[in-house]
Amino acid sequence: MTTHSRPERVGQEIQAAIGDLLTRGMLRDPRIGYITITGVKVSPDLRVARVFYSMMGNEQERADTQKGLEAAKGFVRREVTSAVNLRVSPEIFFSFDESVGEGDKIDRLLREVRNKEGW
């Protein structure tokens, strides 16, 4: 049986709540592109939640999405606090998840090696 700390459990609940907001189209800012919430790290005191997201697109689209998410922080914070039923409303920070792009880069390099070697 795996045991998870409270911040990990709350992070998973926050991730699900924000995913639900996105699925239901409640973030209507046109700057926010199609994003995927890849994870949430919550501080031990549950007062800060860093939300990691990924998206396809160029640097300008990423910057626009970040601005849209920053503008929606208050709304997201209220909705998350209500959905997760938290006593303290965590401050939300959005961060682009670079690991997805790095994984894509590694996959591309492996494909190139396979094609060169004839695997």
Swiss-Prot record:
Gene3D superfamilies (alphabetical): 3.30.300.20
Subcellular location: Cytoplasm
Keywords: Cytoplasm, Ribosome biogenesis
Gene Ontology, cellular component aspect: cytosol
GO molecular function, one term: ribosomal small subunit binding
Domain of life: Bacteria
Signal peptide as annotated in the record: none
GO annotation terms (biological process): maturation of SSU-rRNA
Subunit structure: Monomer. Binds 30S ribosomal subunits, but not 50S ribosomal subunits or 70S ribosomes.
PANTHER family in alphabetical order: RIBOSOME-BINDING FACTOR A, CHLOROPLASTIC-RELATED
Task of the protein: One of several proteins that assist in the late maturation steps of the functional core of the 30S ribosomal subunit. Associates with free 30S ribosomal subunits (but not with 30S subunits that are part of 70S ribosomes or polysomes). Required for efficient processing of 16S rRNA. May interact with the 5'-terminal helix region of 16S rRNA.
Entry's family note: Belongs to the RbfA family.
Protein name: Ribosome-binding factor A
